[in-house]
Amino acid sequence: MSKNIDWDNLGFGYVETDYRYLTTYKDGKWDEGGLITDANVVLNECAGVFQYAQTVFEGLKAYYTKDGHIVCFRPDLNADRLNQSCERLVMPTLPEGRFLEAVKEVVKANKDFVPPYGHGASLYIRPYMMGTNSVIGVKPADEYQFRVFTTPVGPYFKGGAKPIKIRITDFDRAAPHGTGHIKAGLNYAMSLYAITDAHSKGYAENMYLDAATRTHVEETGGANFIFITKDGKLVTPKSDSILPSITRRSLMYVAEHYLGMTVEHRPIHKDELKDFAEMGLCGTAAVISPVGQIDTPEGTINVPAGMDDMGPITKKLYDTLLGIQHGEIEAPEGWVVKIC
């Protein structure tokens, strides 16, 4: 039975659910793990996660399809990306099967928090890992916890996705050969000052350039960019310091195999921005957030698609991917994983 939640007015925030998953790594191995009810995490004051930010995380969603099943979208890619993040921060990896089973268990246990089909809402899933034993010298922790919690969230955009205004920022998101390609908490902490500053000046997001030359487009603090050329190609930035977005990867496939578009994954010079017909940010939360205006050091770029609605090609990409996720359009094999 669904929880007594006003699904039509559900915001995008944290709502505590009944169960979460926990498994502990100690003496070189993971324990059996399982569901728990306590939403609090109790750790020593000197835990590695507190002292040296040794934590990584993922984000995905569960939702009802039109035929009444609860599903997740490409969770195997989240498992793989989590392990890439773990390896970079000298943390133990988690077998893909354990990751997928943890996600399935916690979603099944909280199925009453999955919003009904058609509301645009979903059950957000947050897997994360952290160093838990006391570490006073700068070194990796020896003990870790992998946890998964869930929270029901409303649609990222109430009333539809309207184009946003962003800026090219002077701040750097990630250094060459740094940690920009992984989903680590430290990367997001570094972006907080820049996004707070952007919001105070009327911008929804920052566009980061590469730190080495400050000439090529990277991403925002939490989303990848997609661009549509005037002749209908999908172009996405290529860089070793960009987080490999699962949504972007999926949109590239949809563009080529469902919409017959030419797809280019390559470095994008900032001087090209004025020539694109449509722009957007992509990620798990919003899928696509259209961009209508960019303020640059050289002046303002008004995207031809405008500030009123999502551009026509971006809208096709958005609608097609959403249709795949919700069972309205046939999905490639393995993309949509049934939970129950």
Describe the role of every protein-language-model region.
Residues 14-25, 48, 161-209, 313-340:
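Active-site-adjacent loop/helix segments that line or gate small-molecule/cofactor pockets in enzymes
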Residues 1-37:
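Short, Gly/Pro- and small/polar-rich lid/capping loops
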Residues 24-30, 56, 63-68, 75, ...:
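Short acidic-glycine loop/turn motifs at beta-strand connectors
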Residues 44-61, 285-289:
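Conserved phosphate/anionic-ligand binding catalytic regions in large, soluble enzymes, centered on
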Residues 96-97, 113-122, 206-209, 261-269, ...:
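Flexible, glycine/charged-enriched surface loops at secondary-structure junctions
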Residues 6, 75-78, 83, 89-201, ...:
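Extended Lys/Arg-rich, glycine-bearing segments that form polyanion-binding/interaction patches
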Residues 2-11, 15-17, 158, 212, ...:
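Conserved catalytic-core subdomain
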